[in-house]
Amino acid sequence: MAFLKGKKMAELPVLEDAYIYIQSGRIAEVGLMKDLRMLPDISHIIDASRRIVIPGYVDCHTHLVFGTWRNEEFVDKIKGLSYQEIAARGGGILQSAARLGAMSEDQLYELAKSRLQQCIRNGTVGIEIKSGYGLSLESELKIMRVIKRLKLDSSI
């Protein structure tokens, strides 16, 4: 397997007329059709001719467990407001932490579960969910419990 680094990362490798062999739900082998040999346990063939097959997305840094969106702050940042100005208007991480702290674990779980399901529908196959918006031991532990529940209840 070759790893890309530096300028090579800007090149998109393409395999044309290729196969992907899936075994037990995982990619076991990839190659060119001209090199295809007899593979064991082929029970289902998907003809992807004239189609594109891309890998699933792995999101290695998410904060999926939070109380509410902060899209108004994003607009404020675009308009040039500083973080201090946003905080003075009642926004920022302190507002997020307060909203999160006021919510029950079940409420946070349902919101995060919905967000996770949307990620999966959009092609995410692996995700790392981080805490960090609790700003107190109690809230951070609540976030971690929600993350644990999501892990137990999710396919990824």
State what each model feature region is:
Residues 15-17, 29, 52, 79-86, ...:
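Short low-complexity stretches enriched in small and charged residues
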Residues 20, 25, 50, 61, ...:
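Divalent metal-coordination and catalytic microenvironments
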Residues 24-26, 31-34, 52, 57-58, ...:
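Short glycine-rich, polar/acidic loop-and-turn segments at beta strand-coil junctions
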